Regions:
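Conserved structural motif at the start of ABC-family nucleotide-binding domains
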Residues: 2, 16-19
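The feature captures the beta-strand-to-loop junction immediately N-terminal to the Walker
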Residues: 33-35
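Helix-to-loop junction immediately C-terminal to a conserved catalytic motif
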Residues: 48
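Conserved ABC transporter NBD signature motif
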Residues: 56-63, 76, 109
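ABC ATPase NBD coupling module
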Residues: 64-79
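Q-loop/switch helix immediately C-terminal to the Walker
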Residues: 84, 90-106
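Walker B catalytic motif
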Residues: 158-159
Length: 225
């Protein structure tokens, strides 16, 4: 599915990623974790094309995408969920879901995507994307957009950021449902134990290098290191 070969990245004379070699398998829930400043979010942005590596190659389904811009990577089937979702002024929730799907969709279809993330469609479908929506609501709307897009690979950059406990519990439910019903691949950047606990594979990043690979059955050892 996704392969990174010898990826390195530096900024302001500081080495952030150093010779990263990584394979992400299809139809798996993979989590990249590690201490703050280890390069996790930078790695996610490099995969999406928001940052350009200083060296190395990125392959998606066998195709070299190292030099492809964000929009072309999105067209190939890579989706990205930000730590803080963007508020699109003047658009409704339905507008965003329709834009994400790439097609004109019926109201009941859009409502189904909202239901998938635990939102009451009648209350949200025509709402404006504005400051009245909480961080947790925006996060789930963004996930509904990604479900509508049906990305082959969806990247979540610290999905727990900026949301309350109730919203986080709902987020875990959404991830568990996506994992059990979707044939697509999920890559999450997170240090939250409950997200690590549902991962098929856990990759530990420290000081810009991969130091270990494991799974949730070895979670206690991971968290103690």
């Amino acid at each position: 599915m996704l392969e990174l070969k010898n990826i390195s990245f530096a900024r302001d004379n500081k080495q952030i990623l150093n010779n990263i070699n990584l394979k992400i398998d299809s139809n798996k829930f993979t989590v990249i974790t590690g201490p703050n400043g280890s390069g996790k979010s930078t790695l996610a942005k490099i995969i999406m094309g928001m940052e350009t590596p200083d060296s190395g190659k990125i392959f998606f389904e066998g195709k070299d995408i190292t030099k492809l811009p964000i929009n072309e990577r999105a067209n190939l089937g890579i989706g990205f969920a930000f730590q803080q979702p963007v508020r699109f002024k003047g658009l409704t929730v339905k507008d965003l879901i329709e834009i994400s799907s790439g097609n004109s969709i019926k109201m009941n279809e859009a409502c189904n995507y909202l239901a998938d993330v635990g939102l009451c469609a009648k209350e949200y479908i025509n709402r404006q994307i504005d400051s009245k929506l909480s961080g947790g609501e925006l996060k789930r709307i963004e996930i509904a957009m990604l479900i509508a897009k049906n990305s082959k690979l969806t990247i979540f950059d610290e999905p727990e950021a900026g949301i309350d406990l109730w919203s986080f519990n709902n987020l875990i439910n959404v991830f568990e449902k996506m994992k059990s019903t979707s044939e697509n691949t999920i890559l999450a950047i997170s240090h939250q134990e409950r997200i690590l606990n549902i991962a098929d594979e856990i990759i530990i990043l420290k000081d810009g290098e991969i130091v270990d690979k494991s799974n949730s059955s070895n979670l206690k050892n991971i968290l103690s290191n």
